[in-house]
């Protein structure tokens, strides 16, 4: 079992032989989808792998509705694909260029108060700060709170050493790719 990071990595590992590749972003997208539409099942899976933060009587319930995706890399694309099955509408903000595919509003630029307003964050139920930069993701959270303090805030934490900063930011849900993989493998082994 190996972490699927990109096309080059997949190609390299395919030469090794039988290797099961797991993408933390695809797994997380499925988990978020489950948390929105079957929250108790999602909470039960987390409880099985020993997540101390799980409350089976009050499972995490990300809201249904329109979302803003900040960053349309591997995580943003996986979330877009998984949640589109339920006709979730997205506004996508990405600085690296126009998103290649997907429906909804696409905004090219860095995430700031203006682009969040253009993406209609004030009318959205949630925001995903899903870039590959922890600093950028924290900055996105702070900007998002000024536009819609009631939005469900989901953030990607890339490096464990930034845990204190992410906990202080008080996002509704923190996604750590390495933790997603570890828990998925543990659940697979149970």
Give residue ranges: language-model regions:
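Cytosolic regulatory regions of ion transport systems
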Residues: 1-190
């Amino acid at each position: 079992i190996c972490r699927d990071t990109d096309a080059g990595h997949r190609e390299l590992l395919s030469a090794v032989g039988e290797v099961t590749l797991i993408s933390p972003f695809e797994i997380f997208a499925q988990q978020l989808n489950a948390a929105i539409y079957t929250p108790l099942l999602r909470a039960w899976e987390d409880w099985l792998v020993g997540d101390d933060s799980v409350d089976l009587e009050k499972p995490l319930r990300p809201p249904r509705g329109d979302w803003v995706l900040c960053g349309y890399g591997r995580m943003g694309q996986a979330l877009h694909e998984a949640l589109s099955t339920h006709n979730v509408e997205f506004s996508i903000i990405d600085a690296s260029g126009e998103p290649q595919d997907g429906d909804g509003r696409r905004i090219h630029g860095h995430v700031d108060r203006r682009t969040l307003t253009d993406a209609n964050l004030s009318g959205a139920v949630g925001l995903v700060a899903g870039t590959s930069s922890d600093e950028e993701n924290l900055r996105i959270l702070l900007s998002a709170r000024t536009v819609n303090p009631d939005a469900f805030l989901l953030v990607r934490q890339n490096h464990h050493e930034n845990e204190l900063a992410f906990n202080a930011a008080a996002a509704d849900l923190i996604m750590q790719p390495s933790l997603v993989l570890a828990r998925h493998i543990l659940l697979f082994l149970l």
